[in-house]
């Protein structure tokens, strides 16, 4: 119940250097910038990407080329312009490559987390809500086998269903957070000089955001676990329609076992806030370690331009990866309980994750969060909370592989252009 991408990575929105304002060249006198501080008044960084993993609690990326002295673990910075004519051309070429690399790295990260990982998310959720299952799929080997069976019997759509609704949930979450923060004094970001009151208000904003997005998250969950065998061809906005219908009590008829939204608020907000806190702490901790390691390596020996550019992007990507992995693993049992509560009473038909074919109904009768936890522990054991965990292993293995491949491609491009 959280944006898959926490706030902070502004790779897609990175701008370096100056822009050519040709349309206004004749109306205003030319300005000369003698120092990096003069340039800082005119060259600014754009806002962070909505939905990105900015878990720095108020940190913003500095303008390109402007040295930063507040962080002791940063490496040496480069001046944006050179005095010589040939150096200026080379600097512009390096700047264009740097901007292209930032866009490519950000795009690869977005693609991995929201597209490439979606089949793993689909199977993981189906295993979590399947209380009938005898095979828990705790290892990636059984998960790959069942993925192949689903693809063979139902086609590729069986593993990519509901992807559009996940983007809608992210959009609703971001929009709700922005609107609430605009009309209330609740801070959207926490500054370095924080106070307990500011932290509490920030977490309250997150909680209200999760409450607003909760019915749409429930509708998206149904789309991702509903069997493709009996699935109708629904539009991309079906998630919005079902979410609104869930709030006003209209739409698809549900059974009497459907839990009211009020009883789902606590587990939904608990999972979302804990996921955000764990991700924030781990991301901050890992990023601090990586920056300190980079700073020490710069002091020990001279660093190549290729390594310097890699150090500008990849520490934050690695920190985001570690934060997302740890929070998903730690909160996996709570996520299983949350999904079972959301799916109960919706008359959803899921695929049989034991056989790879046939379908199964969801007929649980949990009275609430505590009853769900006790029932899973008694009937399925402790490992019942970890059904489908092998899909998480596959998901983050793919993510790590894409990060490594992106780093290799980026290093090759830099070596050929420097």
UniProtKB/Swiss-Prot annotation:
<dbReference type="GO" id="GO:0022011">
    <property type="term" value="P:myelination in peripheral nervous system"/>
</dbReference>
<dbReference type="GO" id="GO:0007416">
    <property type="term" value="P:synapse assembly"/>
</dbReference>
<dbReference type="GO" id="GO:0000422">
    <property type="term" value="P:autophagy of mitochondrion"/>
</dbReference>
<feature type="region of interest" description="Disordered">
    <location>
        <begin position="44"/>
        <end position="93"/>
    </location>
</feature>
<keyword id="KW-0813">Transport</keyword>
<dbReference type="Pfam" id="PF00153">
    <property type="entry name" value="Mito_carr"/>
</dbReference>
<dbReference type="GO" id="GO:0016358">
    <property type="term" value="P:dendrite development"/>
</dbReference>
<dbReference type="GO" id="GO:0031987">
    <property type="term" value="P:locomotion involved in locomotory behavior"/>
</dbReference>
<dbReference type="GO" id="GO:0044877">
    <property type="term" value="F:protein-containing complex binding"/>
</dbReference>
<dbReference type="GO" id="GO:0061564">
    <property type="term" value="P:axon development"/>
</dbReference>
<dbReference type="GO" id="GO:0051649">
    <property type="term" value="P:establishment of localization in cell"/>
</dbReference>
<dbReference type="GO" id="GO:0090149">
    <property type="term" value="P:mitochondrial membrane fission"/>
</dbReference>
<feature type="repeat" description="Solcar 1">
    <location>
        <begin position="96"/>
        <end position="187"/>
    </location>
</feature>
<keyword id="KW-1000">Mitochondrion outer membrane</keyword>
<keyword id="KW-0496">Mitochondrion</keyword>
<protein>
    <recommendedName>
        <fullName>Mitochondrial outer membrane protein SLC25A46</fullName>
    </recommendedName>
</protein>
<comment type="function">
    <text>Transmembrane protein of the mitochondrial outer membrane that controls mitochondrial organization. May regulate the assembly of the MICOS (mitochondrial contact site and cristae organizing system) complex which is essential to the biogenesis and dynamics of mitochondrial cristae, the inwards folds of the inner mitochondrial membrane. Through its interaction with the EMC (endoplasmic reticulum membrane protein complex), could regulate mitochondrial lipid homeostasis and thereby mitochondrial fission.</text>
</comment>
<dbReference type="GO" id="GO:0055091">
    <property type="term" value="P:phospholipid homeostasis"/>
</dbReference>
<keyword id="KW-1133">Transmembrane helix</keyword>
<feature type="repeat" description="Solcar 2">
    <location>
        <begin position="311"/>
        <end position="413"/>
    </location>
</feature>
<keyword id="KW-0677">Repeat</keyword>
<dbReference type="GO" id="GO:0065003">
    <property type="term" value="P:protein-containing complex assembly"/>
</dbReference>
<feature type="transmembrane region" description="Helical; Name=6">
    <location>
        <begin position="382"/>
        <end position="402"/>
    </location>
</feature>
<dbReference type="GO" id="GO:0005739">
    <property type="term" value="C:mitochondrion"/>
</dbReference>
<dbReference type="GO" id="GO:0042407">
    <property type="term" value="P:cristae formation"/>
</dbReference>
<keyword id="KW-0812">Transmembrane</keyword>
<dbReference type="GO" id="GO:0021702">
    <property type="term" value="P:cerebellar Purkinje cell differentiation"/>
</dbReference>
<keyword id="KW-0144">Charcot-Marie-Tooth disease</keyword>
<dbReference type="GO" id="GO:0005741">
    <property type="term" value="C:mitochondrial outer membrane"/>
</dbReference>
<feature type="modified residue" description="Phosphothreonine">
    <location>
        <position position="45"/>
    </location>
</feature>
<keyword id="KW-0597">Phosphoprotein</keyword>
<dbReference type="InterPro" id="IPR023395">
    <property type="entry name" value="Mt_carrier_dom_sf"/>
</dbReference>
<dbReference type="GO" id="GO:0000266">
    <property type="term" value="P:mitochondrial fission"/>
</dbReference>
<keyword id="KW-0523">Neurodegeneration</keyword>
<feature type="transmembrane region" description="Helical; Name=4">
    <location>
        <begin position="258"/>
        <end position="278"/>
    </location>
</feature>
<dbReference type="InterPro" id="IPR018108">
    <property type="entry name" value="Mitochondrial_sb/sol_carrier"/>
</dbReference>
<feature type="region of interest" description="Disordered">
    <location>
        <begin position="1"/>
        <end position="30"/>
    </location>
</feature>
<feature type="transmembrane region" description="Helical; Name=5">
    <location>
        <begin position="314"/>
        <end position="334"/>
    </location>
</feature>
<feature type="transmembrane region" description="Helical; Name=3">
    <location>
        <begin position="202"/>
        <end position="222"/>
    </location>
</feature>
<dbReference type="GO" id="GO:0008535">
    <property type="term" value="P:respiratory chain complex IV assembly"/>
</dbReference>
<dbReference type="InterPro" id="IPR039158">
    <property type="entry name" value="SLC25A46"/>
</dbReference>
<dbReference type="GO" id="GO:0006839">
    <property type="term" value="P:mitochondrial transport"/>
</dbReference>
